[in-house]
Amino acid sequence: MVRPVDLRKKLLAFVDNSLGRDTEILLPITFVFEKYLNVEVKFKFIWDLLYIKRWQPDIILLPNIRGHNLYVEIANFSRKSGIMVLALDSEGNFNPNNAQHYWGYNYQQKSIQEWVTCWSQKAFEYAKKFHEKEDQKKIVITGATGFDRYIFMPKSSKSKTLTQLKATHYQMVIGYAGWAFGKLYNSQRNHSFKNFFPENRMKGLEWLEGQRLKVRDMLKSAIEAHPDVLFVLKKHPKEDFEDQPIEGLNEMNELSHYSNVRYVKNEISIEELINVSDIWTGFETTTLFEAWLYNKPTIILNNDTNFPRTEHYKGSLIAKNIEEFQAMITKQKETKDLEQLLEKKILGKRKTLIESAIGFQDGCNHLRAMYFFQKSIVNIKDSKNVSLNMRHLRLYLLMEIGRFFYKKRLFIQLPGFRKSIYVFENRALPGLEQRKEKVYTALDKFHHKKGLHHFLNENKWESLWSVLNKN
């Protein structure tokens, strides 16, 4: 049995945004650390690297160590300083034949963290291909913690969400999850799409632009043909780069002027948008899995499978053109049962597809991850050697001094200052504490409802693990 932490340890979690995917991945983990392991937790913005020196944490927690260069820098610096690094994974579906795609910004292509958490058995097998033999023992299957909220969070009322959208008079809602086509109009587009069509980059980019226009036109035709239907278009959370606050063209923002369209960025959570929708759609998005967890019918606006994609299209309706999309909307209007169009065997595949992608759908993936993380607590070093890093100091001074001069309207006009808009808008992590309180409250109720709090209170992790594996 692993003993609970007797002297209060400190955990520092870094995120690049106060709300959204990465934050949702970490909050269930920090809840268990705080409530059951008596660990002090703080969240910081990723530019606040100097806080590692100032606070001297025992544990660094990250949503991933490949999706952002600063996540990798934080992990490397912390490990060299004698601080334990724990990390999850923001994306569990990757190309099994492309090491560069797997490692991302982790150019050394070596695991830095204590455990390499995988969403599924399939991801586990793929990950082993990219890790040296000595690191393969770190690779474990936990499921995707960010998907747990679709099970443990209470569903927001549709009327409340429609009120937020200022659209209470609509009886039918169609949601669309954006694909980050806006990166095509970004100065870093070649870096963004380097793993797409590597044999002919320009041809691939031209193909993507063609797909953007096709999806835009499908949405536009549906919006114009169904003025009584509300279309909620959700921008991809990772579409924008830090140095380009001016949005590039995507498949949605040319449609935002229609009265029956709401173009949403981060104002409303993705689970609330899925919940309010009668149909959930996308070009290529793992949110289709999330829609299935809410028993929502799903449509893919893309019939071309000749590019890297997950297998969720095998469990969704596919609209190949404008006419098919229109017919599906009409079918839902008339019958309220769009998925009559799907064969029963396809609907039956969804459970398998979900498990293949995100591992488990019981809301307990965060506990599977914590089963491994808590094993490492006894290995926390009593002594640390956190040196003063001049780059971290410069970033801190830029933020501290710059905040006195920051004016968004001015900075957006100055190319050299545009990157800093992202920093000043996000450094304080606005809204995080409110979201944290909601998630923590929901998790506490969920653990009690499932009878899991007894294991956690009594530190019976092996018994808990046995229960989780039976489900």
Predicted regions and their residues:
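Donor nucleotide-activated moiety binding/catalytic core segment of transferases
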Residues: Q211, K238-F289, L293-Y294
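Short, conserved active-site loop motifs that form the nucleotide-linked donor/cofactor pocket
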Residues: E114, I139, S259-R262, S316-L317
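Catalytic binding pocket for nucleotide-activated donors in carbohydrate/polymer assembly enzymes
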Residues: G248-S256, T286-Q361, Y422
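Conserved catalytic-core segment of nucleotide-activated headgroup transferases in glycan assembly
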Residues: F152-E251
